[in-house]
Swiss-Prot record:
Name of this protein: Nucleoside diphosphate kinase
Localization, UniProt: Cytoplasm
Physiological role: Major role in the synthesis of nucleoside triphosphates other than ATP. The ATP gamma phosphate is transferred to the NDP beta phosphate via a ping-pong mechanism, using a phosphorylated active-site intermediate.
Keywords per UniProt: ATP-binding, Cytoplasm, Kinase, Magnesium, Metal-binding, Nucleotide metabolism, Nucleotide-binding, Phosphoprotein, Transferase
Quaternary assembly: Homotetramer.
GO biological process, alphabetically ordered: CTP biosynthetic process; GTP biosynthetic process; UTP biosynthetic process
Record flagged with keyword Magnesium: yes
Record Pfam families: NDK
Similarity-based family: Belongs to the NDK family.
Gene from which the chain derives: ndk
Organism: Legionella pneumophila (strain Lens)
Residues involved in ATP binding: 11, 59, 87, 93, 104, 114
UniProt-listed Enzyme Commission number(s): 2.7.4.6
Main location: cytoplasm
One function term, GO molecular function aspect: metal ion binding
Length: 141
Protein backbone atom coordinates (compact mmCIF):
# COMPACT_ATOMS: atom_id res chain seq x y z
CA UNK A 1 0.00 0.00 0.00
CA UNK A 2 1.28 3.48 -0.86
CA UNK A 3 2.11 5.89 1.91
CA UNK A 4 -0.12 8.92 2.27
CA UNK A 5 0.62 12.49 3.29
CA UNK A 6 -1.54 14.48 5.70
CA UNK A 7 -1.33 17.89 7.33
CA UNK A 8 -1.31 18.35 11.08
CA UNK A 9 -1.40 21.58 13.06
CA UNK A 10 -0.61 21.73 16.76
CA UNK A 11 -2.85 24.62 17.81
CA UNK A 12 -1.97 27.58 20.08
CA UNK A 13 -3.37 25.95 23.23
CA UNK A 14 -1.15 22.88 22.91
CA UNK A 15 1.91 24.94 21.90
CA UNK A 16 1.39 27.08 25.03
CA UNK A 17 1.32 23.91 27.16
CA UNK A 18 4.72 22.83 25.75
CA UNK A 19 3.43 19.42 24.62
CA UNK A 20 4.79 19.52 21.04
CA UNK A 21 7.36 16.83 21.83
CA UNK A 22 4.77 14.56 23.42
CA UNK A 23 2.51 14.93 20.38
CA UNK A 24 5.42 14.25 17.99
CA UNK A 25 6.21 11.08 19.94
CA UNK A 26 2.64 9.91 19.40
CA UNK A 27 2.90 10.54 15.66
CA UNK A 28 6.11 8.54 15.44
CA UNK A 29 4.88 5.67 17.63
CA UNK A 30 1.87 5.40 15.29
CA UNK A 31 4.20 5.00 12.30
CA UNK A 32 3.77 8.55 10.99
CA UNK A 33 7.01 10.18 9.84
CA UNK A 34 7.34 13.96 10.06
CA UNK A 35 8.54 15.01 6.59
CA UNK A 36 8.16 18.79 6.99
CA UNK A 37 7.59 21.08 9.97
CA UNK A 38 7.56 24.74 10.92
CA UNK A 39 6.45 26.92 13.79
CA UNK A 40 4.69 30.11 12.80
CA UNK A 41 2.31 32.78 13.99
CA UNK A 42 -0.61 32.80 11.56
CA UNK A 43 -1.89 36.16 10.35
CA UNK A 44 -5.63 36.79 10.32
CA UNK A 45 -5.52 36.65 6.51
CA UNK A 46 -3.78 33.24 6.55
CA UNK A 47 -6.21 31.77 9.09
CA UNK A 48 -9.25 33.11 7.23
CA UNK A 49 -7.97 31.73 3.94
CA UNK A 50 -7.02 28.32 5.41
CA UNK A 51 -10.42 27.90 7.10
CA UNK A 52 -12.38 29.51 4.23
CA UNK A 53 -14.51 26.35 3.91
CA UNK A 54 -16.04 27.31 7.29
CA UNK A 55 -16.57 31.02 6.50
CA UNK A 56 -20.39 30.80 6.60
CA UNK A 57 -20.43 28.80 9.85
CA UNK A 58 -21.25 30.57 13.14
CA UNK A 59 -17.93 29.52 14.73
CA UNK A 60 -15.71 30.95 11.94
CA UNK A 61 -14.71 34.20 13.70
CA UNK A 62 -13.94 32.44 16.98
CA UNK A 63 -11.91 29.78 15.14
CA UNK A 64 -9.84 32.40 13.32
CA UNK A 65 -9.35 34.44 16.52
CA UNK A 66 -8.17 31.32 18.33
CA UNK A 67 -5.80 30.22 15.55
CA UNK A 68 -4.05 33.62 15.56
CA UNK A 69 -3.88 33.84 19.37
CA UNK A 70 -0.41 32.30 19.53
CA UNK A 71 2.12 30.30 17.56
CA UNK A 72 1.19 27.03 15.88
CA UNK A 73 3.33 24.06 14.84
CA UNK A 74 2.52 22.85 11.34
CA UNK A 75 3.76 19.51 10.06
CA UNK A 76 3.31 17.09 7.19
CA UNK A 77 2.98 13.46 8.27
CA UNK A 78 3.71 10.49 6.01
CA UNK A 79 2.70 6.88 6.51
CA UNK A 80 0.32 4.05 5.69
CA UNK A 81 -3.25 5.40 5.90
CA UNK A 82 -1.82 8.66 7.28
CA UNK A 83 -5.09 10.62 7.12
CA UNK A 84 -7.13 8.04 9.03
CA UNK A 85 -4.30 7.15 11.42
CA UNK A 86 -3.73 10.79 12.36
CA UNK A 87 -7.45 11.37 12.92
CA UNK A 88 -7.58 8.27 15.12
CA UNK A 89 -4.74 9.40 17.38
CA UNK A 90 -6.15 12.96 17.48
CA UNK A 91 -9.49 11.77 18.87
CA UNK A 92 -12.95 13.31 18.55
CA UNK A 93 -13.22 17.06 17.90
CA UNK A 94 -14.86 17.52 21.30
CA UNK A 95 -12.29 16.36 23.88
CA UNK A 96 -15.11 15.27 26.21
CA UNK A 97 -16.02 12.68 23.56
CA UNK A 98 -12.44 11.73 22.68
CA UNK A 99 -11.24 8.24 23.56
CA UNK A 100 -8.77 7.99 26.47
CA UNK A 101 -5.17 8.18 25.30
CA UNK A 102 -5.90 10.33 22.25
CA UNK A 103 -4.22 13.71 21.81
CA UNK A 104 -7.43 15.65 22.41
CA UNK A 105 -8.44 13.60 25.46
CA UNK A 106 -5.03 14.22 27.00
CA UNK A 107 -4.21 17.80 25.94
CA UNK A 108 -7.35 19.67 24.76
CA UNK A 109 -9.38 22.01 26.96
CA UNK A 110 -12.57 22.42 24.93
CA UNK A 111 -14.18 21.89 21.55
CA UNK A 112 -12.60 25.21 20.50
CA UNK A 113 -9.18 24.82 22.14
CA UNK A 114 -8.86 21.23 20.99
CA UNK A 115 -5.07 20.98 20.60
CA UNK A 116 -4.73 19.78 17.00
CA UNK A 117 -6.03 20.00 13.45
CA UNK A 118 -5.74 17.14 10.97
CA UNK A 119 -6.75 16.81 7.34
CA UNK A 120 -10.03 14.91 6.93
CA UNK A 121 -9.41 13.49 3.43
CA UNK A 122 -6.61 12.93 0.94
CA UNK A 123 -7.99 15.74 -1.23
CA UNK A 124 -8.03 18.21 1.66
CA UNK A 125 -4.61 17.00 2.79
CA UNK A 126 -3.14 17.88 -0.61
CA UNK A 127 -4.78 21.32 -0.55
CA UNK A 128 -3.75 22.02 3.06
CA UNK A 129 -0.15 20.87 2.54
CA UNK A 130 0.16 23.11 -0.53
CA UNK A 131 -1.21 26.03 1.52
CA UNK A 132 1.72 25.90 3.97
CA UNK A 133 4.57 24.12 2.16
CA UNK A 134 6.34 24.22 -1.20
CA UNK A 135 7.02 20.77 -2.70
CA UNK A 136 10.79 21.10 -2.13
CA UNK A 137 10.19 21.56 1.63
CA UNK A 138 8.95 17.97 2.03
CA UNK A 139 11.77 15.58 2.88
CA UNK A 140 11.92 12.02 1.59
CA UNK A 141 11.82 9.66 4.59
Amino acid sequence: MAKELTLSIIKPDAVAKSVIGEIYTRFEKAGLDIVAAKMTQLSREQAESFYDIHRARPFFKDLVDFMISGPVMIQVLKGENAVAKNREIMGATNPKEAAPGTIRADFADSIDANAVHGSDSLENAAREIAFFFEPHELCNR
